[in-house]
């Protein structure tokens, strides 16, 4: 759908002499032309044209060999600039090969004839990599030479090759003969691999008899189009080593011109077709088989002088005696994009590096034409953004309004036929007029929203074209149009015309000449902006018709640019031919394939298959371009598109972007950023209905209707409801509500910074909206929108199912005809079984019956079920319904209200463990509450809560049960106190105290056992023993001294303290020995690991773990599907069992810490940690023991114990803590996991008794 737009049509100054050939110096961007070899000048003159268009003579020379013996002057067969020797190579028809130095040293000759080819040169051509030189001699031989002119091969062009290689077979793919047309269609029996007519290779009447050579773009093959004996034309293909690869099949009317597509797919030549009196471009594959064609739309006898592909293989130039046609292709259709008038028999040449630069060489001048392939579409605003795209195809203009219909090319919505080949086209700013022109005529068409295109008029512009070359066309506002032309001396001029429909005349509104070359123009708000060849922008005010001074420019000239109005300023956006996108002087992105501007965005596609959006702001520096990884963050300003996609048009009113794929087809997408922008615009305008429809169409979260502006929404609830109006739309909105604010996440407004975004937080948002909308619907649309009202109940959190059912109950009582619809709607929103249960919970059997009728329940089941309830008395019915619904607490309440049902009440309470509820129901009936409390106490004791049971028993006067419960709970104080209060039996009290003392000793509660012996058993000796065992030495001393029995103090207490001292000393010694042995072993292990870590790791094999068992985790985390979650066995479950088994084995090895394994160090370190914990645990006990020893005059033992224990704690600080500060090398760290930072315990010094030595 692209058109060829001319940026530059420059005529170089005249060269003195007749130009014979042209060559390009891509290194310094210079051009060399050869003149002479005619009657006026039999010698050779070479001129150099610099990049600044300065013409200077490079060299002039002559040689006797340039003129033959019979007086004929030699001809140039090829001219090539060679980069490595920095020389021009000329091959002459007489056989001379001349090398001309472009920058010779003083001692070098500027030119040299390096050799002569015997029998002359018929054709010659250098390969594109300048490494191989191919020559066809007059002796029917083909020579392949290196760049140093060493012969690679010399082969005779034998006619026998035609017979040997003329065995082309086509299997007929794609032909009608090979297509299946139905089994009943009788087809003529024939071989589909053979054509119906076999060409003999008859020569065209306009064949010039010349031989052409053309290399493939990668220089691996060369093709030769020459006359063979017969005579017929044949294309031979040779490898760069000189081996014949193929010969083309014969074609009637084939001409001599030849051009190999640089991409290498096909060879192009021209054929005169007498069957339809036309000329065609036909294509051959490298193997010589035909591969497509297209008509040149010319007569059979038309003479063609040139055929050339541009370097990018996108344009095919075909020249006749007085014009050059430029063809492009897309979707298997060939478009005639431009036809340029040229001097008689001029030569055409494409620049070898600049793909869209064409040189036309006349007799004594050179024209340079620079094109750009671009979509003809202009910056337009809503609602005039129809996406009107005109496509030039010869004398036809193919027009498609993409907003109304997306028709892939080459098809179109309108085909406008003109009397001339269209050179340029444009649409105006409001997309209601279309213009087409060549260099003499301008035609205008009108377009309206009813999809009609009518001819407005045709106007003569030839009177303005004298000395100018019209190159581009730009529609302005209304029926105004701008024509841009290039003149001589690298200057430009523009005309602004107004088309008059009445007299079909043009009114010149403005005109201006520029001394510099203008590449292209843009129109914006009655301002014209022109870009010079240096990238500078010039503005022209159409209102005052004068040039205004502006400081806008691009760093480099842009092949396409547009000026966008943003907040009363102008922002120029331009794209260079090298894919660099600029906003004035700022580089926005590189690798850009296409761009488009709307009122709010700059859109562009990149070579990384991304479509990006940039919010337009008035300051260029504030334009934010997201990085490529933004697509992974789901940023709305970046999205993935198909590879090679280019933007054709963007239509903000449709929120659409039309992309064209490399193969030519169109695709319309709706980017989220444009859709959201449209939704926000609708919300601001209170067009909630339109915003809702957009969200519904593009599957946006409907919460944005509220979250974007909650205050605006809450103030305009009637507007919102009236905008949606339809019940199903309101239902959809209500069911889509959720508590989250979508504008803070996926739908955040990226045009604002985080500080600019104000987020209004609404607590309980869903319930609030449901309530407000329900209130409005109830007051205004209660009779028609009952369905939406029900939805509002069910969408609250939690759902108000009972309220909705209550509403339906009201409809039933009112005998409304909408009851069935309401119930059906509820069954759609909520599980019908749940609704049935809730209806039962309301004790409304009629409502439950109606709901059951909407379900899949069997009437033979639910009808008797409901009938059974219907027969029961009201309280019994409610009780049974609550039991069915497992609402046991409610059922218990109904049971309490029944008469003579207290026993059933107690049994029901016991059955369902409803003791707290039962106590609450009878909180004002003390007798009943007492009975409930007794059964509750029984339950508590049976479930291991004897302490609570004992309290309950005691509160209701069940003393014996309370005593037993207290004993079970070990609460000796409560047990003995209640026993002393209720009985005078000393024996019973003593027996109970003995039992309790024994229980305390079993539970290692020695202090409690001592208290019982002292207070209730009058056994001070046992009390002293138990107090010492409980480390309560001070209490033991007090009891011993209080008895007044010296034997208890001297014999028993001293003896028990001695035992405690011995146990403590033994424990401290064990600590010391463990610290010594384990710290030494850890240091040894760490030293070995440092010296030989591999051997340390191999220590894991000492336990003879089988080789096929991995100790590392191999568990897989997979999500179960709906089907696999119910299977009995699977590979993953087996693997889980195996892995769990390995993990348990690994933990057992870790716990053992076997010597020599990788687990040993970890085991020893953990053992030291446990030792420190044990030392800290007994620290207060040792301190109390020291005090007791001193008080009993056992200072020697106290000093010894204090010294040893203090030494242990000191050793821990000196030796153990440094070891614990180093991360432990566990089995996991050996497998590559990161070690965890160690937790070092804080061990304080032991607080000694200062009175001890």
UniProtKB/Swiss-Prot annotation:
Residues 1142-1153 have a biased composition (Basic residues). Keywords: Cytoplasm, tRNA processing. GO terms for molecular function: tRNA binding. GO terms for biological process: regulation of cytoplasmic translational fidelity; tRNA wobble base 5-methoxycarbonylmethyl-2-thiouridinylation. SUPFAM superfamilies: WD40 repeat-like (SSF50978). The keyword Cytoplasm applies. Component of the elongator complex, a multiprotein complex which is required for multiple tRNA modifications, including mcm5U (5-methoxycarbonylmethyl uridine), mcm5s2U (5-methoxycarbonylmethyl-2-thiouridine), and ncm5U (5-carbamoylmethyl uridine). The elongator complex catalyzes formation of carboxymethyluridine in the wobble base at position 34 in tRNAs. ELP1 binds to tRNA, mediating interaction of the elongator complex with tRNA. Homodimer. Component of the elongator complex. This is Elongator complex protein 1. It comes from Schizosaccharomyces pombe (strain 972 / ATCC 24843) (Fission yeast). The gene is elp1.
């Amino acid at each position: 759908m692209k058109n060829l737009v001319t940026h530059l049509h420059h005529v170089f100054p005249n060269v003195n002499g007749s130009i014979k050939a042209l060559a390009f110096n891509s290194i310094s961007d210079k051009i060399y032309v050869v003149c002479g070899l005619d009657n006026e000048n039999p010698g050779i003159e070479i001129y150099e044209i610099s990049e600044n268009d300065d013409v200077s003579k490079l060299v002039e020379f002559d040689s006797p060999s340039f003129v033959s013996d019979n007086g004929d002057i030699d001809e140039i067969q090829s001219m090539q600039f060679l980069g490595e020797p920095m020389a021009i190579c000329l091959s002459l028809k007489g056989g001379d090969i001349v090398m001309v130095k472009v920058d010779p040293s003083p001692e070098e000759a500027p030119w040299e004839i390096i050799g002569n080819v015997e029998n002359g040169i018929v054709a010659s051509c250098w390969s594109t990599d300048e490494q191989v030189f191919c020559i066809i001699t007059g002796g029917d031989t083909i020579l392949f030479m290196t760049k140093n002119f060493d012969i690679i091969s010399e082969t005779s062009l034998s006619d026998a090759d035609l017979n040997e290689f003329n065995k082309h077979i086509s299997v007929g793919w794609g032909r009608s003969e090979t297509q299946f047309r139905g089994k009943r269609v009788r087809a003529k029996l024939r071989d589909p691999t053979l054509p119906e007519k076999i060409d003999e290779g008859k020569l065209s009447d306009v064949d010039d008899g010349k031989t052409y050579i053309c290399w493939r773009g990668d220089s691996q093959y060369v093709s030769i189009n020459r006359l063979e004996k017969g005579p017929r034309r044949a294309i031979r293909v040779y490898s760069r080593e000189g081996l014949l690869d193929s010969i083309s099949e014969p074609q009637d009317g084939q001409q001599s011109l030849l051009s190999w597509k640089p991409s290498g797919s096909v060879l192009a030549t021209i054929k005169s077709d007498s069957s339809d009196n036309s000329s065609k471009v036909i294509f051959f594959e490298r193997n010589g088989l035909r591969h497509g064609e297209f008509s040149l739309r010319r007569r059979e006898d038309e003479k063609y002088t040139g055929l050339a592909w541009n370097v990018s293989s996108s344009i095919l130039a075909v020249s006749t005696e007085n014009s050059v046609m430029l063809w492009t292709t897309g979707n298997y259709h060939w478009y005639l994009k431009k036809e340029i008038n040229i001097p008689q028999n001029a030569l055409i040449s494409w620049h070898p590096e600049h793909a869209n630069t064409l040189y036309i060489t006349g007799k004594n001048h050179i024209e340079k034409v620079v094109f750009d392939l671009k979509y003809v579409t202009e910056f337009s605003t809503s609602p005039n953004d129809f996406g009107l795209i005109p496509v030039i195809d010869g004398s036809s203009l193919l027009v498609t309004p993409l907003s109304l219909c997306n028709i892939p090319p080459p098809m179109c919505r309108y085909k406008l036929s003109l009397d001339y080949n269209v050179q340029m086209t444009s649409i105006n700013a409001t997309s209601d007029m279309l213009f087409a022109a060549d260099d003499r005529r301008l035609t205008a068409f009108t377009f309206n929203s009813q999809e009609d295109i009518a001819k407005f008029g045709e106007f003569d512009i030839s009177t303005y074209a004298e000395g100018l070359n019209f190159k581009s066309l730009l529609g302005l506002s209304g029926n105004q149009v701008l024509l841009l032309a290039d003149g001589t001396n690298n200057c430009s001029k523009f005309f602004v015309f107004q088309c008059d429909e009445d007299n079909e005349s043009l009114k010149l509104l403005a005109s201006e000449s520029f001394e510099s070359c203008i590449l292209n123009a843009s129109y914006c708000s009655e301002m014209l902006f022109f870009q010079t060849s240096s990238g500078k922008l010039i503005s022209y005010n159409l209102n005052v018709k004068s040039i205004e001074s502006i400081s806008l420019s691009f760093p480099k000239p842009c092949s396409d640019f547009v000026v966008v109005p943003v907040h009363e300023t102008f922002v120029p956006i331009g794209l260079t031919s090298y894919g660099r996108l600029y906003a004035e002087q700022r580089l926005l992105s590189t690798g850009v394939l296409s761009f488009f501007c709307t009122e709010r965005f700059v859109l562009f596609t990149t070579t990384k298959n991304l479509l990006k959006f940039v919010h337009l702001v008035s300051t260029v520096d504030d334009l934010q371009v997201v990085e490529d990884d933004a697509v992974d963050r789901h940023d709305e300003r970046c999205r993935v598109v198909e590879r090679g996609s280019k933007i054709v048009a963007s239509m903000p009113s449709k929120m659409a972007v039309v992309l064209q794929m490399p193969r030519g087809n169109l695709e319309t997408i709706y980017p989220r950023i444009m859709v959201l922008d449209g939704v926000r615009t609708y919300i601001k305008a209170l067009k909630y209905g339109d915003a809702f429809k957009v969200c519904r169409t593009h599957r946006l979260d409907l919460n944005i209707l509220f979250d974007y502006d909650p205050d605006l929404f809450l103030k305009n609830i009637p507007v919102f409801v009236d905008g949606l109006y339809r019940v199903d739309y309101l239902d959809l909105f209500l069911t889509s509500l959720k508590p989250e604010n979508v504008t803070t996440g996926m739908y955040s407004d990226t045009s604002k910074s985080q500080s600019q975004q104000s987020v209004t937080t609404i607590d309980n948002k869903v319930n609030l909206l449901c309530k407000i909308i329900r209130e409005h619907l109830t007051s205004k649309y209660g009779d028609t929108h009952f369905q939406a009202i029900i939805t509002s109940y069910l969408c609250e959190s939690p759902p108000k199912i009972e309220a909705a059912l209550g509403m339906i109950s009201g409809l039933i009582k009112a005998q409304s005809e909408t009851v069935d619809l309401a119930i059906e709607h509820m069954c759609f929103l909520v599980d019908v079984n749940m609704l049935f249960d809730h209806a039962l919970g309301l004790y409304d059997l009629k409502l439950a019956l109606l709901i059951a009728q909407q379900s899949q329940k069997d009437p033979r089941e639910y009808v008797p079920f409901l009938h059974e309830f219907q027969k029961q008395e009201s309280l019994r019915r409610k009780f049974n319904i609550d039991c069915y619904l497992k609402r046991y607490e409610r059922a218990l309440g109904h049971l309490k209200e029944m008469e003579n049902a207290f026993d059933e009440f107690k049994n029901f309470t016991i059955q369902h463990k409803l003791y707290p509820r039962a106590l609450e129901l009878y909180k004002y009936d003390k007798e009943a509450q007492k009975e409930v409390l007794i059964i509750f106490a029984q339950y508590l004791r049976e479930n291991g809560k004897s302490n609570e049971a004992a309290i309950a028993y005691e509160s209701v006067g069940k003393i014996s049960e309370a005593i037993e419960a207290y004993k079970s709970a070990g609460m000796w104080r409560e047990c003995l106190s209640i026993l002393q209060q209720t009985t005078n039996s000393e024996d019973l009290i003593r027996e109970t105290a003995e039992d309790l003392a024994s229980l305390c000793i079993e539970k290692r509660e020695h202090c409690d056992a001592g208290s019982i012996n002292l207070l209730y058993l009058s056994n001070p000796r046992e009390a002293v023993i138990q107090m010492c065992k409980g480390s309560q030495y001070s209490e033991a001393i007090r009891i011993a001294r209080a008895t007044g029995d010296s034997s208890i103090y001297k014999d028993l207490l001293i003896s028990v303290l001695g035992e405690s001292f011995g146990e403590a000393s033994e424990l401290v010694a064990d600590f010391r020995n463990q610290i010594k042995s384990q710290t030494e072993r850890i240091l040894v292990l760490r030293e070995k690991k440092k010296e030989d870590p591999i051997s340390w790791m191999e220590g894991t094999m000492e336990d003879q773990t089988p080789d096929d068992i991995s100790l590392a985790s191999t568990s897989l985390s997979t999500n179960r599907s709906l089907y696999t979650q119910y299977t009995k066995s699977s590979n993953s479950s087996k693997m889980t069992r195996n892995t769990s088994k390995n993990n348990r084995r690994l933990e057992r090895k870790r716990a053992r810490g076997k010597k020599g394994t990788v687990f040993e160090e970890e085991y020893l370190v953990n053992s030291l940690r446990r030792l420190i914990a044990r030392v800290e645990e007994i620290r207060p006990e040792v301190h109390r023991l020291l005090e007791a020893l001193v008080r009993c005059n056992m200072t020697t033992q106290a000093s010894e114990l204090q010294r040893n224990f203090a030494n242990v704690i000191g050793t821990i600080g000196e030796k153990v803590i440094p070891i614990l500060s180093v991360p432990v090398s566990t089995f996991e760290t050996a497998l590559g996991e990161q070690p965890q930072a160690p937790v070092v315990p804080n061990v304080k010094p032991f607080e000694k008794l200062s009175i001890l030595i």
